[in-house]
Amino acid sequence: LPEIRDVKPEDVAVVELSSFQLISMRRSPNVAVITNLSPNHLDVHKDMDEYVNAKKNVLLHQNAFGRTVLNADNALTAACAADTRGMTYMFSRREKTNGAWCSADGKIYFGDEYIMEESDIRIPGKHNVENYLAAISAVWGDVSKEVIRTVAKEFNGVEHRMEFVRELDGVRWYNDSIATSPSRAMIGTL
């Protein structure tokens, strides 16, 4: 958080929070996103219900003006829609939704509006397509389609998360050391 001193009131912050950070949370951001819920950190949480409830804290304290973005392709995540108070956008790689979605021929839309091609996304992996669908749903109406496309084409990802290291003898090497659970490590290989 070395940039905290440079943050102005009109700036927007994007923060990824773990279940450990969310478990005691009693306030929610204006925009909340849950990409996927799967059995993670069950060595710390007493059971899956505790883990899911911790994650849901990100949206439970929103008001009627809040925006929640959920993955329609993940049943546990989609079920969180029952707990939202404001506008809820669903995103999907498989079917049309009220948020961002990807068609079978690789076109990305928000509702009925075409945005870009899936192939425009520079960073590899179907999970990154889902991340873009979530991000588009989170910023729709506040960020132009042109900016969304530019970011997709130019963003190289974040350090330690499927970070391209080099290509040697036809093999592409990636650093995915941030993957802290088996499911995250497996997703990074797809």
Write out the residue ranges for each language-model feature.
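Short glycine/serine/threonine-rich phosphate/pyrophosphate-binding segments
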Residues: 1, 17, 181-185
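Acidic, Mg2+-coordinating active-site environments of NTP-dependent enzymes
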Residues: 3, 7-10, 29, 34-173
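Switch II (G3) loop of P-loop NTPases
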Residues: 11-19, 173-178
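Short, glycine/acidic-enriched loop or turn micro-motifs at the edges of active sites
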Residues: 19, 39, 74, 178-180
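Carbohydrate-associated surface elements
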Residues: 22
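Hydrophobic Walker B segment
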Residues: 26
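Glycine-rich phosphate/pyrophosphate-binding beta-alpha loops
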Residues: 157-160, 173-187
